[in-house]
A protein has these predicted regions:
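Short loop->beta transition adjacent to catalytic acidic/histidine clusters or analogous donor-positioning motifs
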Residues: 2-3, 24-34, 42, 54-55
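Short beta-strand/loop segment that forms part of the nucleotide-sugar
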Residues: 7, 30-39, 58-59, 88
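Short, well-formed alpha-helical segments that are part of the catalytic scaffolds
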Residues: 12-25
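Donor nucleotide-sugar binding loop of glycosyltransferases
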Residues: 12-15, 39, 95
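A conserved acidic beta->alpha catalytic loop
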Residues: 36-45, 92
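Conserved donor nucleotide-binding strand/loop of the catalytic core
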Residues: 44-80
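Short beta-strand-to-loop acidic/aromatic patch adjacent to the donor-nucleotide binding site
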Residues: 82-93
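Conserved donor NDP-sugar-binding/catalytic core segment of glycosyltransferases
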Residues: 100-114
Length: 114
């Protein structure tokens, strides 16, 4: 099963490594898609320097906003055959520990919001 966590970013250099590590620690079948809105603080470079095959990045040329980042992420995930898609904020306002319970609920539901 291919599961994807979409993390839009803008100036998340102080949070992004911790967020990625916490997300990937939840389960082995997770990949992460970072959608960076041209963060001037170097967020995209930090992500690329991790050089992790479970992490993908879309670098956008300008700040296009959270909503369009999620739309682009959903489109990318469907093109890449992910079965389950999780959206989270990169600032840890969403607790990565909730990923497993949410994925379990998706076994018997089409949509889980938490």
């Amino acid at each position: 099963m291919k599961n994807l966590v979409i993390l839009p970013t803008y100036n998340e250099s102080k949070n992004i490594v911790k967020t990625i590590n916490l997300v990937l620690a939840q389960r082995d079948d997770l990949n992460i898609l970072i959608i960076d809105d041209n963060s001037p603080d170097g967020t995209a470079k930090i992500v690329k320097d991790l050089n992790n095959e479970k992490i993908f990045i879309i670098e956008r040329e300008s700040k296009k906003g959270l909503g369009s980042a999620y739309v682009e992420g959903f489109s990318w995930s469907l093109k890449n055959n992910y079965q389950k898609i999780i959206q989270m904020d990169a600032d840890l306002s969403h607790d990565p520990k909730e990923i497993n319970p949410m994925l379990s609920l998706l076994e018997s539901n089409d949509l889980v919001i938490g």
